[in-house]
């Protein structure tokens, strides 16, 4: 009986959500304007304490309160401003509304940024 109680206690502890959970999400973009838009969308998500997007690696590094948000919610919010993530693609009409400089789906735009 004691062994069962110990297992239940350990299981509950393992599922405890963290207030300062570090996670990274891959987000498509090409420039500093993209960076600003992506970070703003992430930071406007309830429970996000820190967000920084790296132009070269396309990784959005986050510190989140898992009691208030999750990565899927953040991905939805980032896609809502026009940026694809690994899990969620931005709607075409939203993507088409971003600045021409930020059209990360266009190989010519991506190549032009690689030359910088």
List PLM regions with ranges.
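Bacterial Sec-dependent N-terminal signal peptides
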Residues: 1-19
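Short amphipathic alpha-helices in soluble, non-transmembrane regions
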Residues: 37-41, 73-82
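A generic structural motif
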Residues: 58-65
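Helix N-cap motif at beta-to-alpha junctions
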Residues: 65-71
């Amino acid at each position: 009986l004691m062994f069962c109680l110990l297992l239940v206690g350990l299981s509950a502890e393992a599922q405890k959500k963290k207030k300062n959970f570090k996670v990274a999400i891959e987000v498509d973009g090409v420039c500093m304007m993209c960076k600003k838009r992506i970070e703003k969308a992430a930071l406007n998500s309830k429970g996000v304490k820190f967000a920084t997007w790296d132009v070269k690696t396309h990784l959005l590094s986050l510190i989140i309160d898992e009691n208030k948000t999750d990565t899927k919610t953040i991905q939805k919010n980032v896609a809502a401003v026009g940026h694809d993530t690994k899990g969620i693609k931005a709607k075409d009409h939203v993507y088409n509304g971003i600045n021409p400089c930020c059209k990360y789906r266009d190989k010519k735009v991506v190549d032009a940024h690689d030359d910088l």
